[in-house]
């Protein structure tokens, strides 16, 4: 027999998953790993790291993945390590004590809808500021014991991981998440099977798995369509954050809004207030309207109930930033809903239009949110004003400054963003109840009692940690992107821990103003190469994959950073995420922000830096317009000198250079014998004492309750009392007023001759009398005089609104009188308007019928 030289069959491989078998004495580690609580409790994070520091780094600081990969011998050794067990048990006791506290039932309950949540870098379901804010919000809701739940998506690929080519080109890498190794859990049905939510899309259903993230005491429910029950196209609905075309975006928003409400029903969850964090979630009110109509209400009655319990928070300052959908596309998926709500297709479209009845106007989610939510708010004082202007077309008859759009300035979750070194310092010198009273300025003023030297040592320690982190984490990246390793070594050597370190990190959109620093490269080169005042800049940030201008800006900065005069002085760090952000906001000396005014709705990165003794240098826009105090940071004025943006940029750049050269650098380097600048430490103390207490997430959450949640919940419960008796009355009253509105007549209107001629004297009062035929309505009309003036830019503003008093009634005739005058001389315009009035209305824009008259 001839022996073959090679004789083997093909192996039959079977994939098996081997998970760590956790000893009983370490079971509490699994419980804590599955709750995001560890992400803002440093001792818990450190506990997981100590289990296996090398593996902790290898798994990207993910405790779930860490426990899965710990080998059995390591686990057995830990299970008998008395010192480690003592530490684990102490932290677990604190965790269980925290979790045992029940929600405060004296405060309204809230359902919170958002497209993204930034909870930890481990869970890639966020892209930027909106998500970070939402994540911070849920964490603070947990810390503040609020009855809240979140609704969002579990993205298979999340937002992209950024890498940069040798020439600075951004490369977007989408890496699939392994859900089994993330800090979340499947929601099961009554048969202990994975829960499936069926969401109607006109002629078919999309099927979503449901996951739960435990954010301390707050549950966050995430929908996931990437399963075999769906078509290939529908599986991709939850593949990428803001991914795909406009059709996919609409599918996402249907799933978030309509699917989110269906999920709450399936889970048996009912809340007092439904909070749409951005317009992406606005369609939640479509499903809520359907539910109330199908329970027996008319559409108008259902709208009263839904509106009374809904809040819309807008985050964009420009109309182009809102989502608009063509009628054909919108009808493809939403065509069946009008019938369920008892209205026409035109009625539904008009709820999303500024100009109802205009067939050329697309459906806008933000307009729909404004029309179906009682309250609307921006995210800073200035953004509130910008939003009043932006949405003014929805409420015709009122000037922008009159409408009900309010604001709550964004804050940051202190335990998440404050470095452990600063927490230790605050705990040492502040009140023991500091964490429960973060918004109390008196407590923060105790920073003035902290020795200067201790603050300086804290700052130096964190700066060195950042520099070491950069050297460790980014050496491989730089080697990959540079042909010459010696150049990388040279770059590393040029990073100077004693230099003033300025950070600029955010989403790279052109309006964020990263280009300003590079307006005059010769002047910038002189600044960064001054041997007496060394300074270095750290940049980080991602540009949207479809934003060519933003990507071009990144490329330009990297090209400049590779020039000999800027090598090691300007550094761009790739893949900006929460992990890198925490290092930057605690490690740099100055946090710079230079957005185009007034396009920064709020901005919170500077607030995070503030908590870590980092001084802000920013345009007076967003939160810094409110936060800036002289001696507590530096600012560029909020006022534009030029309408031409290029000229304004040149002026702003020159101002930045000048402030750096004449104020910031001399102050930083005015060192005493102990090696630090007393003036610099004073600036740090001022910023912490005078600014920090006003920008915590605790303050933000309390503001939402004080300004919106409380009054909405109170009104909602009043409306639903006695089988919705008030709802029925109010809807009937509105219907009657609407039916008779065009018939109401101004029978007579008597003004003095001076007013008729348009010539009046300041300080002199005039009497006006107006008789109105209300056509059978019962004192349902208000009359007022509106006085306006025009400023130097040609913008018309309200000078005064003077109500006329109803003094007599004869049948349907109501007589109104007013005695008023103008105290200031000048040129004004005067007109009169009537409007429906009812104490049951939350504000005028809730029933926006207005008729102007002057004769």
Q: Residue spans of the language-model regions?
A:
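Catalytic cores of carbohydrate-active enzymes across secretory and cytosolic contexts
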Residues: 1-855
């Amino acid at each position: 027999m001839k022996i073959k030289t090679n004789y083997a069959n093909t192996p039959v491989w079977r994939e098996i998953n081997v998970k760590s078998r956790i000893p009983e004495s370490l079971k509490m580690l699994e419980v804590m790993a599955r709750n995001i609580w560890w992400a803002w409790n440093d001792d818990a994070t450190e506990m997981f790291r100590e289990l296996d520091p090398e593996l902790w780094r290898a798994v990207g600081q993910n405790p779930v993945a860490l426990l899965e990969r710990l080998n059995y011998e390591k686990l057995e050794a830990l299970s008998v390590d008395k010192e480690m067990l003592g530490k684990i048990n102490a932290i677990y006791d604190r965790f269980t004590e925290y979790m045992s506290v029940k929600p405060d039932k004296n405060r309204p309950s809230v359902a919170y809808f958002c497209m993204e949540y930034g909870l930890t870098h481990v869970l890639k379901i966020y892209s930027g500021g909106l998500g970070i804010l939402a994540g911070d919000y849920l964490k603070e809701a947990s810390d503040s014991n609020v009855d809240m739940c979140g609704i969002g998506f579990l993205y298979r690929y999340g937002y992209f991981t950024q890498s940069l080519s040798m020439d600075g080109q951004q490369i977007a890498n989408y890496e699939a998440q392994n859900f089994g190794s993330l800090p979340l859990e499947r929601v099961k049905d009554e048969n202990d099977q994975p829960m499936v939510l069926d969401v109607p899309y006109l002629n078919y259903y999309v099927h979503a798995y449901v996951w739960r993230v435990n954010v301390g005491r707050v549950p966050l429910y995430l929908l996931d369509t990437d399963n075999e029950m769906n078509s290939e196209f529908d599986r991709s609905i939850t593949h990428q954050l803001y991914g795909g075309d406009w059709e996919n975006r609409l599918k996402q928003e249907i799933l978030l809004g309509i699917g989110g409400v269906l999920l709450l029903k399936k889970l048996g969850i009912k809340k007092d207030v439904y909070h749409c964090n951005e317009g992406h979630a606005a369609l939640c009110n479509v499903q809520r309207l359907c539910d109330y109509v199908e329970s027996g209400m008319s559409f108008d009655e259902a709208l009263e109930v839904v509106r009374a319990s809904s809040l819309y928070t807008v985050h964009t300052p420009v109309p182009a930033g809102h989502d608009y959908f063509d009628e054909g596309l919108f009808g493809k998926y939403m065509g069946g809903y009008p019938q369920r709500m008892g209205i026409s297709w035109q009625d539904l479209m008009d709820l999303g239009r500024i100009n109802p009845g205009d067939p050329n106007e697309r459906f806008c989610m933000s307009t729909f949110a404004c029309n179906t939510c009682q309250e609307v708010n921006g995210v800073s004082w200035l953004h509130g004003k910008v939003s009043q202007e932006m949405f003014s077309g929805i409420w015709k008859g009122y000037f922008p400054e009159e409408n009900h759009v309010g604001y709550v300035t964004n804050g940051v979750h202190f335990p998440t963003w404050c470095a452990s070194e600063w927490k230790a310092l605050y705990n040492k010198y502040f009140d023991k109840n500091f964490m429960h009273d973060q918004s109390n300025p008196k407590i923060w003023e105790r920073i003035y009692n902290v020795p200067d030297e201790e603050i300086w040592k804290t700052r130096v320690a964190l700066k060195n940690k950042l520099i070491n982190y950069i050297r460790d984490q980014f050496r491989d990246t730089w080697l990959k992107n540079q042909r010459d390793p010696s150049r990388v070594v040279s770059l590393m050597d040029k990073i100077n821990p004693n230099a003033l370190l300025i950070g600029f990190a955010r989403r790279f959109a052109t309006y964020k103003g990263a280009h300003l620093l590079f307006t005059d490269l010769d002047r910038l080169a002189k600044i960064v190469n001054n041997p007496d005042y060394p300074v270095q800049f750290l940049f980080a940030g991602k540009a949207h994959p479809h934003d060519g201008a933003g990507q071009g800006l990144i490329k330009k900065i990297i090209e400049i950073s590779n020039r000999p005069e800027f090598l090691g002085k300007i550094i761009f760090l790739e893949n900006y995420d929460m992990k890198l952000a925490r290092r930057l906001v605690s490690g740099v000396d100055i946090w710079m922000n230079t957005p185009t005014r007034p396009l920064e709705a709020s901005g919170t990165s500077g607030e995070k830096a503030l908590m870590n003794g980092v001084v802000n240098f920013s345009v007076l826009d967003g939160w810094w317009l409110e936060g800036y105090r002289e001696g507590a940071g530096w600012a560029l004025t909020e006022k534009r000198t030029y309408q031409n943006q290029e000229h304004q940029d040149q002026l702003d750049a020159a101002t930045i250079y000048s402030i750096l050269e004449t104020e910031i650098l001399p102050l930083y380097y005015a060192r005493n014998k102990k090696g630090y600048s007393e003036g610099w430490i004073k600036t740090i103390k001022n910023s912490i004492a005078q600014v920090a207490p006003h920008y915590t997430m605790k303050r933000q959450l309390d503001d939402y309750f004080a300004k919106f949640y409380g009054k909405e919940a109170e009104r909602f419960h009043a409306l639903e009392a006695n089988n919705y008796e008030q709802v029925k009355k109010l809807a009937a009253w509105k219907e009657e007023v609407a039916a008779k509105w065009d018939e109401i007549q101004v029978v007579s209107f008597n003004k003095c001759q001076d007013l008729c001629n348009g010539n009046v004297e300041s300080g002199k009062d005039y009497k006006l009398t107006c008789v109105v035929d209300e056509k059978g309505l019962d004192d349902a009309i208000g009359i007022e005089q509106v006085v306006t003036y025009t400023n130097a830019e040609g913008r018309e503003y309200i000078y005064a609104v003077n109500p006329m008093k109803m003094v007599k009634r004869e049948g349907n005739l109501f007589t109104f009188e007013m005695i008023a005058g103008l105290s200031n001389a000048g040129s004004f315009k005067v007109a009169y308007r009537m409007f429906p009035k009812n104490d049951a209305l939350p504000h005028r824009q809730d029933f926006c019928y207005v008729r102007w008259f002057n004769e």
